[in-house]
Amino acid sequence: ANKFKNSACSLAVITVKDGQIIKKAYSLIKPPFMSFDDECIEIHGIQPKDVLHEKTFDQLWNAIYENHLKGNIMVAHNAKFDMNVLRATLDYYKIPWPELDYACTVKLSRAVWPDLVNHKLNTMAAYIGVEFKHHYALDDAETCAKVVLEAAKLKGVNSLPDLLKATGVPLEPFIDDKNRSAQDALHKEPEPEQMSFF
């Protein structure tokens, strides 16, 4: 919605199993503060009135995690950005970070199709023949999944771990040593002498 990373106003998740898309989830999100930057509205087309009566992220998270993310590898295009948005939003609602791994389809696209003019999601969609509405979260997520499936087909592998191994693209932890201490501090119970009473 705005420049703050915890201001996501929509989310989408696509679940892939055995090379097939088996589940989809999409929702608008009411962000913590109803402040929308014009530049952001121009990108995704979502306005404050669209999310006024939608659920907040914390009301959606458990279902998304249990039904789509738990036990799976997350994949996103320019994943570092999406992971930072997810971390910031989890932090805002004081939700512990999940123990998950993720991979980036920008890195994957560069490894599999190095000669393309660029590896933006709309470029990849056009290259693999997928029509989609850019910056509409569900289409973005589905296109991302199809990039992975096309790359796996090209490399002759049947799983994401095998694809990453074949291309040298890293599988990255959502919680690494660098950010684990900050996450632990956020959720640590205060010692008795640190407690304040009002």
Task: Please provide the spans of the model-predicted regions.
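Conserved non-catalytic scaffold segment of RNase H-like nuclease domains
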Residues: 1-99, 114, 119-135
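Ser/Thr-centric signal marking residues that sit
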Residues: 27, 105, 144
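Acidic active-site catalytic centers that drive phospho-/nucleotidyl reactions
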Residues: 78, 82, 104, 140
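Buried hydrophobic packing segments
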Residues: 86, 108, 144-148
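Conserved beta-strand -> loop -> alpha-helix junction used to position metal-binding or nucleic-acid-contacting
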Residues: 96-109
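Acidic, divalent-metal-coordinating active-site segment for phosphoryl/phosphodiester hydrolysis
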Residues: 137-151
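Acidic two-metal-ion nuclease catalytic site recognized across multiple nuclease folds
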Residues: 149-198
